[in-house]
Amino acid sequence: MENAHTKSPAECLSYFGVNEHTGLSPDQFKKNLDKFGYNELPAEEGKSIWDLIVEQFEDLLVRILLLAACISFVLAWFEEGEETITAFVEPFVILLILIANAIVGVWQERNAEDAIEALKEYEPEMGKVYRSDRKSVQRIKAREIVPGDIVEVSVGDKVPADIRIVSIKSTTLRVDQSILTGESVSVIKHTESVPDPRAVNQDKKNMLFSGTNIAAGKAIGVAIATGVSTEIGKIRDQMAATEQEKTPLQAKLDEFGEQLSKVISLICVAVWAINIGHFNDPVHGGSWIRGAVYYFKIAVALAVAAIPEGLPAVITTCLALGTRRMAKKNAIVRSLPSVETLGCTSVICSDKTGTLTTNQMCVTKMFIVKSVDGDHVDLNAFDISGSKYTPEGEVSHGGSKTNCSAYDGLVELATICALCNDSSLDYNESKKIYEKVGEATETALCCLVEKMNVFNSNVKNLSRIERANACCTVIKQLMKKNFTLEFSRDRKSMSVYCTPAKGDGGAKMFVKGAPEGVIDRCAYVRVGTTRVPLTSAIKEKIMAVIRDWGTGRDTLRCLALATRDTPLKVEEMNLEDSTKFADYETDMTFVGCVGMLDPPRKEVTGSIELCRDAGIRVIMITGDNKGTAIAICRRIGIFKEDEDVSNKAYTGREFDDLPSQDQAEAVRRACCFARVEPSHKSKIVEFLQGNDDITAMTGDGVNDAPALKKAEIGIAMGSGTAVAKSASEMVLADDNFSSIVAAVEEGRAIYNNMKQFIRYLISSNVGEVVCIFLTAALGLPEALIPVQLLWVNLVTDGLPATALGFNPPDLDIMGKPPRSPKEPLISGWLFFRYMAIGGYVGAATVGGAAWWFLYDSTGPAVTYYQLSHFMQCHNHNEDFTGVDCDIFEASPPMTMALSVLVTIEMCNALNSLSENQSLIRMPPWSNLWLMAAMTLSMSLHFMIIYVDPLPMIFKLTHLTFDQWLMVFKLSFPVILIDEVLKFFARNYIETGKEVK
């Protein structure tokens, strides 16, 4: 049924053809069940494990590696002699890497699908309905409730469907619908129709929503929507329809993979084509096919060399280390790539309640009447410190601390606050904090009484548990509460009927409620211990102060407190009929007024300042009304004190009324959205994404889940619902906005470090490609074989690359604007730099092998012509007289080449400590992890040269002292070359960037 909130109860009942007292007949139930289905949310149809595994292999780099592994595998079958075993090592290792990567990927994806499943925890098991086959109410499974069912709910129940209330069977009906609307206080419901067809859920005061909880009262209503048609069901559909966006890093790596794969394919084809003339060389036994296969193997080796196999593992490790550092700052990251996304966040959309504020109502101001002279009235106003539910804080008057017991008016005000109250404060020993028991507003009044301590009780030596309610207990011992006249919407107040615990003093009635309602029923004002008639002029003055407190910077929620000195006798009252309560609360004396608010967290203002410096816009999104929202924005620095906010703050309704183009413009400018629904949050994220903003969105309720899933970074609160947590990328353990800012800083540092190690690995791979390309182009014997390349890419390069993730962050990291997600990982200049470095790495590696052939004292001392035409070496060729042709497959030159490559890479790791800073400014010991990783890498390299049987597997042998000396001579210049390139970058190429 559409817009049931706009219809009267009778219209809703007739729409379903049902009677409030008898309910649906069995036939009607069967018909409606066939039409609407069971009242449950469908289980999420997750991807099968097989689909998820296949998805992991959709990455281009992974596919190329897979292809290389398959080809190596096929070629290994045709190997002869002792090489058979080593030939199988390479495809086996590649497959192992790919499997490990796929396992990590699948595990991550499985977690993401729990979000929609978690919604099911809000489905109640049972429901109470009236059906015509039974005389009384019957309990049935909630899934069997259909639209048209007459449902009964009472305190403690979870609402089983979306229900239009038909009649309320108690004084009031309060519902906690925070999971759905984010409202921090329970909402009072009624039965009258709400005429606005576009009302937001917060304003549908005659509706009960599936999954919310009844906080007080009892009611009967007609189910108007079940299953997926309920509000919570719509949220499920939104979540199921939200596609997970790729993070900027994933997009970058995809793009990078594509470029790399094109370059690799090109080089492989080129190397193969260059050597077509050599296919018939005698070394291949004169067989053209064997020659083609030999060069095909070299092309495959090239592919293996060009792909940084270690990259996925290093990135995962770096992100995992980042998540550990973030966890220490109370930000628990659920999806690894989002760690880096945080670094380019340009907008943070934050909930108000509990994130920017403490979600702990506190009284910050109060006043009593000081004196009355004719129509002139003087008030005594007091300020109260403290921003949490604790009994600690001071009452001050005119800036100095006050002794509350000196004011009779304050003693009476404290008495009303303590007695006209069903809540209390409790000390939770396991969490070591004070918590509310009951209503937020009433708990704030309990805290006020404790801070006032009007009877000067000795509270210093009490334990925390005793301290929680010490002062309230003293007051409750003096007066006995006989009964309570519950709050009702028509009079907007509640009262308690009390008699003195000792002696024979008369009964009193203490009242608290909305100022306009209470003051209208007051005939007097309290001045000291006497009472003075309340004239309209005095009333106007008091209301003016209350209006002032309710607007402006504070936007306090005000409560008036009053006493009826001579109430009716108990037997004269009808306590069953709540419509009469207003008549009993008349002829009252106004005592005072308290103003409370949900105060901002202390550290938020500083964090918002930090965001401003870092070029990040903070948008506050709240279900509260606009006045309160703007006031909090001013308090925490989102808006300046006197800033004009006419185009910077909107309610959900105002936003909806704008044409689409203006909505986009509004989102570009605004910093505050009030009275919003979940659908608005998703819309705001969409517009921000349209502006190329990277958005972090906070939320804690079920209602926030679709927006959390849609935003690049969904941030759930530690105290939030399971749905919100599983739909998000990050959970704030302490619900604190400042933790988001700390996480953004960490994200920026991680990206910078990631850039360094990606570049480090790439320049290493460029070196390997150049090495293979040079040997093929110059016709030299192969210097490195695939299994050696794999070892370098995975182990010797992987360790320093991982350690680069520990580089210290730049000092001004939060002084720069967020980087654009479109910024390339490797710019034109950097590409040149890494080609230059890679070119040297490749040339030096080939040089090391060639040096052994041409000049080493233990080598064969062949000529360069013989070396570059080694393919033509056979016994009958005069050019090779006296040369043993097997020497061209010896292991010392390979060992030389590999040692040069590994040592150069260690020097290159030092170059990567900083993008442009010289090693003189940023010495190696600024990252001790890197020093340790380099030591370990070199130790592992020595191991494969000197520890049997590894030299056999890797085709290596021992090196002499002179050979090691040559290795170092060839390796060290890479540091000098990069220092020159860094000097140019600092002084000529990237100077503009620094200044900005």
Curated annotation (Swiss-Prot):
Region (Interaction with PLN), start-end ranges: 785-805, 929-940
Keyword Endoplasmic reticulum included in the entry's annotation: yes
SMART domains, per database record: Cation_ATPase_N
Major place of residence: endoplasmic reticulum
Binding site for Ca(2+) 1: V304, A305, I307, E309, N793, D797
Pfam families according to UniProt: Cation_ATPase, Cation_ATPase_C, Cation_ATPase_N, E1-E2_ATPase, Hydrolase
Reaction(s) catalysed (UniProt annotation): Ca(2+)(in) + ATP + H2O = Ca(2+)(out) + ADP + phosphate + H(+)
Entry annotated with the keyword Lipid metabolism: no
Transmembrane segments: 49-69, 90-110, 254-273, 296-313, 755-774, 785-805, 826-848, 895-914, 928-946, 962-982
Localization terms from the record: Endoplasmic reticulum membrane; Sarcoplasmic reticulum membrane
Superkingdom of source: Eukaryota
Annotated positions binding Mg(2+): D351, T353, D700
PROSITE patterns found in the cross-reference section: ATPASE_E1_E2
Membrane topology annotation: Multi-pass membrane protein
Cytoplasmic topological segments: 1-48, 111-253, 314-754, 806-825, 915-927, 983-996
Parts forming coiled coils: none
EC number: 7.2.2.10
Stored PANTHER family: CALCIUM-TRANSPORTING ATPASE
Domain comment (free text): Ca(2+) and ATP binding cause major rearrangements of the cytoplasmic and transmembrane domains. According to the E1-E2 model, Ca(2+) binding to the cytosolic domain of the pump in the high-affinity E1 conformation is followed by the ATP-dependent phosphorylation of the active site Asp, giving rise to E1P. A conformational change of the phosphoenzyme gives rise to the low-affinity E2P state that exposes the Ca(2+) ions to the lumenal side and promotes Ca(2+) release. Dephosphorylation of the active site Asp mediates the subsequent return to the E1 conformation. PLN and SLN both have a single transmembrane helix; both occupy a similar binding site on ATP2A1 that is situated between the ATP2A1 transmembrane helices.
Subunit structure and binding partners: Interacts with sarcolipin (SLN). Interacts with phospholamban (PLN). Interacts with myoregulin (MRLN). Interacts with DWORF.
The name this protein goes by in its record: Sarcoplasmic/endoplasmic reticulum calcium ATPase 1
Source organism: Makaira nigricans
